Amino acid sequence: FFGSVLKLIPKIL
């Protein structure tokens, strides 16, 4: 789960 979130962070930024 967290692994996916960490990959989505750069997209949100």
From Swiss-Prot:
Compartments in which it is found: Secreted
Keyword Transport: no
Any one GO CC term of the record: extracellular region
Residues that bear Leucine amide: 13
Lineage: Eukaryota, Metazoa, Chordata, Craniata, Vertebrata
Coiled coil: none
Keyword check for Secreted: yes
Residues making up the signal peptide according to the UniProt record: none
Main location: secreted
Organism annotation: Pulchrana picturata
Tissue occurrence: Expressed by the skin glands.
UniProt KW keywords: Amidation, Amphibian defense peptide, Antibiotic, Antimicrobial, Secreted
Its biological purpose: Has antibacterial activity against the Gram-positive bacterium S.aureus ATCC 25923 and the Gram-negative bacterium E.coli ATCC 25726.
Protein name as annotated: Temporin-PTa
GO process terms (BP): defense response to bacterium
